[in-house]
Structure formats: structure tokens, C-alpha cells
A protein has these predicted regions:
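Ordered alpha/beta subdomains of enzyme catalytic regions
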Residues: 1-192
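Glycine-rich phosphate/ribose-binding loops and adjacent secondary-structure elements
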Residues: 171-191, 196-219
């Protein structure tokens, strides 16, 4: 039965083990048919999926050891799962997907952080992913050491206010020659807790618009 809004697989489906590769279902069926329940130690290695995500395994009779989120590493297993294989076999696909996606984002964000160690760096990556996983993107950016993120609903999810600048759309709505009016309207409209960051490249080059913004807004 297919009832997916926006092609989103529900958390309940993921926890149930249905969000898996077909061969894991067939493996489970084969082991059940053969009446085999092997005790195993599964390792997640560094060339696959670094970091830890335990909630998916919380209701299963397994022991999990892993390095904490945000820990830098250089080779070796980063997670071990010990227990009856059939208890978590169907969860492998979802588990590795959770770890791989988040750690890939964190690694990329960390490279930016290291390239600009003394500058404020914000994540605007949510516009490039499915909206249902925006909180994954923004949390991963924070784990990497970025200073903030742009996505409002993600902020609700992880209990941290979103931040950002202003979009080109705002300047375009005011029109060419009205950049000062747009910057001043933004300054007047937003709260005192919002940073004033004027976007200075919509109609003219950055130098020209930066000078105009400084003149229009002052200190």
C-alpha cells in the first residue's frame, strides 16, 4: 500500500525495519527458515560511515559502542553492534544511511570551518536537500563547528533559532535603484536580535553596493 506524502518514508516505517534493502529481508527469511540466529559483532568502519546514531537500535537486544558525534578520526571501526544478527539485520540500510548522510555533511562543513577558522560561518545547505531532512543538515553543520544555520523549522526541531542574511528576492521586490530602501526597510522591520547583514550584489557589483549600504545604514 502506497501512501507517501512528498515521497517521505515515515519514522515508524524506518524503525520497523521496512526501510531496508530487499536482500536483508531475504536474509532474515532464510535464517528463519534455517532456524539460525547467529550472535555477531558488526563493525561500521571509517571508510563507510563515521559517527553514531543510536535511536534506531534502542528497542533491540543489542549492545552498541561508537565514537561520539563530531569526533575526528583516522581509520578503524567507529561503531560496533553486538547481538543476535536477526534483531538488527533489516536495520542496516537505514542505519548506514543515517550515518553516511550526516557524516558527509559534517565533514564538508568542517572543511569550510577549517578554511575560515576566525570568521562567522552559517549553513544555507537546506535548500539543496529534501525539506524533510533539513534538520539533519543543520544539526550536522553545528556538529562541524559552524556558527548557525538558516532553516526555521530545523531550528524548531533542534531548539536553536535560525539566522541568516537577506535574500536576493527582497532586493528584487524593491527593484533596481531601490537597494537603499530595501536595506533600510529590513533594518526597520526585523528585531534587535537579528544581525544586520546587507546583501550587496543584486543589481551592481559588490564594491558599489557595499559602499551604498554603508552610507545608507551608517553604524
Amino acid at each position: 500500500m502506497r501512501d507517501l506524502e512528498l515521497d517521505i518514508i515515515s519514522p515508524e516505517t524506518i524503525h520497523s525495519g521496512r526501510a531496508t534493502d530487499a536482500y536483508f529481508e531475504r536474509t532474515d527469511a532464510t535464517l528463519a527458515h534455517a532456524d539460525r540466529t547467529p550472535q555477531v559483532v558488526a563493525e561500521v568502519t571509517a571508510d563507510q560511515f563515521p559517527t553514531g546514531e543510536f535511536a534506531l537500535l534502542a528497542d533491540h537486544a543489542v549492545d552498541v559502542d561508537a565514537i561520539p558525534p563530531g569526533r575526528c578520526f583516522d581509520g578503524g571501526p567507529v561503531m560496533r553492534i553486538s547481538g543476535p544478527y536477526r534483531d538488527f539485520a533489516r536495520l542496516e540500510t537505514a542505519l548506514l544511511g543515517l550515518l553516511s548522510h550526516a557524516s558527509g555533511i559534517t565533514t564538508a562543513a568542517r572543511r569550510v570551518r577549517e578554511a575560515a577558522p576566525d570568521s562567522p560561518v552559517l549553513s544555507f545547505g537546506a535548500r539543496h536537500v529534501h525539506p524533510s531532512i533539513a534538520a539533519v543538515v543543520e544539526r550536522s553543520a553545528l556538529v562541524a563547528g559552524l556558527d548557525g544555520f538558516s532553516h526555521v523549522a530545523a531550528g524548531d526541531q533542534i531548539d536553536r533559532a535560525a539566522s541568516g542574511t537577506m535574500p536576493h528576492a527582497l532586493l528584487l521586490c524593491f527593484g533596481r535603484g531601490e537597494q537603499e530602501a530595501a536595506w533600510q526597510a529590513f533594518d526597520a522591520a526585523v528585531g534587535d536580535d537579528t544581525q544586520r547583514i546587507a546583501l550587496c550584489d543584486t543589481f551592481s557589483d559588490e564594491v558599489d553596493e557595499s559602499l551604498r549600504a554603508a552610507d545608507a545604514l551608517g553604524d
